Curated annotation (Swiss-Prot):
Signal peptide positions (record): 1-33
Gene designation: NCSTN
Cross-referenced PANTHER family: NICASTRIN (PTHR21092:SF0)
Disorder noted: Acne inversa, familial, 1: A chronic relapsing inflammatory disease of the hair follicles characterized by recurrent draining sinuses, painful skin abscesses, and disfiguring scars. Manifestations typically appear after puberty.
Ranges facing Extracellular side: 34-669
Protein name: Nicastrin
Entry comment describing in which tissues the protein is expressed: Detected in brain (at protein level). Widely expressed.
A molecular-function term among this protein's GO annotations: endopeptidase activator activity
Record topology, Cytoplasmic segments: 691-709
Post-translational modification (record): N-glycosylated.
Quaternary assembly: Component of the gamma-secretase complex. The functional gamma-secretase complex is composed of at least four polypeptides: a presenilin homodimer (PSEN1 or PSEN2), nicastrin (NCSTN), APH1 (APH1A or APH1B) and PSENEN/PEN2. Binds to proteolytic processed C-terminal fragments C83 and C99 of the amyloid precursor protein (APP). Interacts with PSEN1 and PSEN2.
Taxonomic source organism: Homo sapiens (Human)
Chief localisation class: membrane
Cell compartments where the protein resides: Membrane; Cytoplasmic vesicle membrane; Melanosome
Length: 709
């Protein structure tokens, strides 16, 4: 009689089912991991880190350890509160939270000296701005990279004559071994302080009990020592690795430039072609990465120049002027004149349509929004004027400016002491290459009026830009502020002076800057970039560059930046003309016989809103507004230790974030670890035993045997 066959081992199907169940349990655990993390940690989403920057000689900025730095939060509201952090507190390291008004050099020096007890620093942005001023920049900006040196005006080198930024404390140029973050959201700051009060506040001087509120900051930087070191490492990686790990990038972007009369950009001007240069800077910075409002240090001046360019372009005889005018907006001037030094380099090498020998005169706008008694100061270089020819040219330049200012009562042009040097300015880089007649227009005769130079406080409030509370955002956009009127007056003086410097004689009085243009530009750059006017002047694919807040003017390493694009398109729309081309023709004008891409740039912009206020009327704008590379020549030449050109780089990083959570005592952490380890061992033993006895525990049911007849 036949019998049914049966196996003594575990059924493979049962083992497969066991593996499937184990996988499902593991997957469920992973899926629940994020949920558990959200219950433990509160992420801080509106923060700005201090990052590491490097140059030819050293590194500045901040960083955390590779796994982030964690510390018990302690709020410092007055100087005495530091004692707990530096000596008395029993649970170091501490994460210090302080209001921005306490963010001073003296306090930072104390923290820097006790790094074993400091995990990091969180700075809450508070208002109003410190009345005494705050500037983390140095007192002599761009020292060593301007025109003055031991061989050229040694008495003016290193700001021996004038400390231009007298309030500068140099914090932004220090190196800190712990992370420092700016808290930009007031609500997040309140959450942190509430957590501190609930868990960390000591009673009667005694130590608080666990759990304690802690903060963790991640900002580990990949680059170290200097630009030469990090660029060399990146170069080696790029040469020998399939997937190179770049550790730093040069600070770079694009200069924005345009010509009053179009020129062929595929060649260079003839030697006898004369060009008047009107220049200003686009960038600023602060202690924190990509927080650079730059209202007085940058925005007011480039807004004024945009308005002057618009006014000059409307002059009736602009196409017949004997000399051309070039408007230039330099990027990276904060970091040792990146933009201007690159343009001078390209001019010298014949890589730019305008050559140095074509420059007839140079008019630069410095800081111009904080004038006192209506005064605008005309700064010149005393050293180059030792040459009689240059002195006569400068005298003619100043006389032209004074004549132009005479028709604008709201602007009083003044000459500082003739032996006074130039303030930090792009003109200095041109003077290093060639003696030219130039002037820098500024609201200060000596040290800066700007108490918040290159700081988080150089905002709209610093230049008195404010709006009535009852107005809507659209009404704010078109509300002409007193600051806009004042800057429009300066733009009118500049426009008329440029008209006369270009050889114009008949229509100087018709050159008039529009306060409406100035107020729209100020609102867009300092209050809300995502507004109807900025939307109308940009390409559709650039809409994402417009946020609901102000634009930031840090040069960065990814380019072009938001500011660069918006300034380019603002310049194009203010000085260009709308041409009757289709979208396809605008994007490829070479197919249109009457158009010339060597002379003009063509942009298909969104245009103004249709009457139904939902659709836009796109159009093609033809202008001479272009971009030119603003990368220091040091990186073109691989001279990473250069003292001639800027060598600033920005370190790369993997993770930038901040979060708070409750931290247990060391004893409880040890107990938890021990129990967890015990459970792990027990689980492994149980798993081993089950696996060893699987043939007994998981016996497959016998199949019914075959029946014999």
């Amino acid at each position: 009689m036949a019998t049914a066959g049966g196996g003594s081992g575990a059924d493979p199907g049962s083992r497969g089912l066991l593996r499937l169940l184990s996988f499902c349990v593991l997957l469920a655990g992973l899926c629940r991991g994020n949920s558990v993390e959200r219950k433990i940690y509160i992420p801080l989403n509106k923060t700005a880190p201090c990052v590491r920057l490097l140059n030819a000689t050293h590194q500045i900025g901040c960083q955390s350890s590779i796994s982030g730095d964690t510390g018990v939060i302690h709020v410092v509201e007055k100087e005495e509160d530091l004692q707990w952090v530096l000596t008395d507190g029993p649970n170091p390291p501490y994460m210090v939270l302080l209001e921005s008004k306490h963010f001073t050099r003296d306090l930072m020096e104390k923290l820097k000296g006790r790094t074993s007890r400091i995990a990091g620093l969180a700075v809450s942005l508070t208002k109003p701005s410190p009345a005494s001023g705050f500037s983390p920049s140095v007192q002599c900006p761009n020292d060593g990279f301007g025109v003055y040196s031991n061989s050229y005006g040694p008495e003016f080198a290193h700001c021996r004559e004038i400390q231009w930024n007298s309030l500068g404390n140099g914090l932004a140029y220090e190196d800190f071994s712990f992370p420092i973050f700016l808290l930009e959201d007031e609500n997040e700051t309140k959450v942190i302080k509430q957590c501190y009060q609930d868990h960390n506040l000591s009673q009667n001087g005694s130590a608080p009990t666990f759990p304690l509120c802690a903060m963790q900051l991640f900002s580990h930087m990949h680059a170290v020592i200097s630009t030469a070191t990090c660029m060399r490492r990146s170069s080696i990686q790029s040469t020998f690795s399939i997937n190179p790990e770049i550790v730093c990038d040069p600070l770079s972007d694009y200069n924005v430039w345009s010509m009053l009369k179009p020129i062929n950009t595929t060649g260079t001007l003839k030697p006898d072609d004369r060009v008047v240069v009107a220049a200003t800077r686009l960038d600023s910075r602060s202690f924190f990465w990509n927080v650079a409002p730059g209202a007085e240090s940058a925005v007011a001046s480039f807004v004024t120049q945009l308005a002057a360019a618009e006014a000059l372009q409307k002059a009736p005889d602009v196409t017949t002027l004997p000399r051309n005018v070039m408007f230039v907006f330099f990027q990276g001037e904060t970091f040792d004149y990146i933009g201007s030094s690159r343009m001078v380099y390209d001019m010298e090498k014949g890589k730019f349509p305008v050559q140095l020998e074509n420059v007839d005169s140079f008019v630069e706008l410095g800081q111009v929004a904080l004038r006192t008694s209506l005064e605008l100061w005309m700064h010149t270089d005393p050293v180059s004027q030792k040459n009689e020819s240059v002195r006569n040219q400068v005298e003619d330049l100043l006389a032209t400016l004074e004549k132009s200012g005479a028709g604008v009562p709201a602007v009083i042009l003044r000459r500082p002491n003739q032996s006074q040097p130039l303030p930090p300015s792009s003109l200095q880089r041109f003077l290093r290459a060639r003696n030219i007649s130039g002037v820098v227009l500024a609201d200060h005769s000596g040290a800066f009026h700007n108490k918040y130079y290159q700081s988080i406080y150089d905002t709209a409030e610093n230049i008195n830009v404010s709006y009535p509370e009852w107005l809507s955002p659209e009404e704010d956009l078109n509300f002409v502020t007193d600051t806009a009127k004042a800057l429009a007056d300066v733009a009118t003086v500049l426009g008329r002076a440029l008209y006369e410097l270009a050889g114009g004689t008949n229509f100087s009085d018709t050159v008039q800057a529009d306060p409406q243009t100035v107020t729209r530009l100020l609102y867009g750059f300092l209050i809300k970039a995502n507004n109807s006017w900025f939307q109308s002047i940009l390409r559709q694919d650039l809409r994402s560059y417009l946020g609901d807040g102000p634009l930031q003017h840090y040069i960065a390493v990814s380019s072009p930046t938001n500011t660069t694009y918006v300034v380019q398109y603002a310049l194009a729309n203010l000085t260009g003309t709308v041409v009757n081309l289709t979208r396809e023709q605008c994007q490829d004008p070479s197919k249109v016989p009457s158009e010339n891409k060597d002379l003009y740039e063509y942009s298909w912009v969104q245009g103004p809103l249709h009457s139904n206020e939902t659709d836009r009327l796109p159009r093609c704008v033809r202008s001479t507004a272009r971009l030119a590379r603003a990368l220091s020549p040091a990186f073109e030449l691989s001279q990473w230790s250069s003292t001639e050109y800027s060598t600033w780089t920005e370190s790369r990083w993997k993770d930038i974030r901040a979060r708070i959570f409750l931290i247990a005592s060391k004893e409880l952490e040890l107990i938890t670890l021990t129990v967890g380890f015990g459970i792990l061992i027990f689980s492994l033993i149980v798993t081993y035993c089950i696996n060893a006895k699987a043939d007994v525990l998981f016996i497959a049911p016998r199949e019914p045997g075959a029946v014999s007849y």
